[in-house]
Amino acid sequence: MKKKVMLVFGTRPEAIKMCPLVNELKTRKNIETIVCVTGQHRQMLNQVLETFNVVPDYDLAIMKQGQTLFDITTGILEKIKAVLENVKPDIVLVHGDTTTTFVTALACFYLQIPVGHVEAGLRTYNIYSPYPEEFNRQAVGIISKYNFAPTELAKKHLLDEGKDATSIYVTGNTVIDAMQHTVIADYHHPELDWVGDSRMIFITAHRRENLGQPMHNMFRAIRRVLNEHPDVKAIYPIHMNPIVRKAADEELGDCKQIHIIDPIEVFDCHNFEARCFLCLTDSGGIQEECPSYGKPVLVMRDTTERPEGVDAGTLKLVGTSEEKIYEWFTKLLDNEEEYAKMAHAANPYGDGHACERIADILEKGYTSI
């Protein structure tokens, strides 16, 4: 009898990392794969689903304008109960640290359905940084029966918290699997024509805890560095959040060396990352993606749940201070030795076979489901 494996996700970052797993599981003869999306993101989620040719079996469609954490939480909790009761999965897989992840795990706990946590064990141990993600992943860690940790450090965190060693599997990160399918040699985009022979900087900035003064600091530092380096051009696919857009327009709107564009598909995002000179971000996933192509990453956050990259030298945690961002952005543009140290550091996040490992475990390894 086939094992019924249900995957639930709702945001663009989750979809990027879960869609390759969906497609891998669908190749396994002993597994029935069911996909439920919550629609926590809408347009950006749909772009990823199309890229990986994943068609959800269920769509909760909870997104609404101006939604709060309260809206997302109650919207998912009210709708997912019926789906879980109808499907009766043997295991539900959730990913990472979103509100979708937390609420789905909570619903499964209420219904006593086993939870498998993909990208388990990331920690900052400050529940307000990143917010609400750090709380979400710690809470899911209490509920989850099976834990797919991307690195040995993530496994150590789980062991330190009292998780049974037999419930933890070090698999690598599924985002590396995703990039093997999306990055191509003959990629073309009009923005790359605009960049030409200039050094390209890829920027993302959207985190909730960076809204307000921290984000203004980030944008001011970027503007200063661009003004001092006429051979550099930046591409910033901006988040839909109107607060982010307002800050970017105020600080970067008349800067000729940066193109602020609408959100791009994962296919474009990965190909931009593979071709950039370096990346400035407050994202989580990009901290794993860019090192796969030897691209240094300046992390514009006060904490990171991915210290492996900092330890390996692929990431530099620069915080949200204007001067610190300015210092390191300038250093990597002007100092070839500093740049080479980061560009040539080993990627600690996996080899592109994480989905196979997870599927093998689900297909063969769980005698209890």
Residues of each region from the PLM?
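Nucleotide-activated sugar donor-binding and catalytic core shared by glycosyltransferases
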Residues: 1-236, 241-369
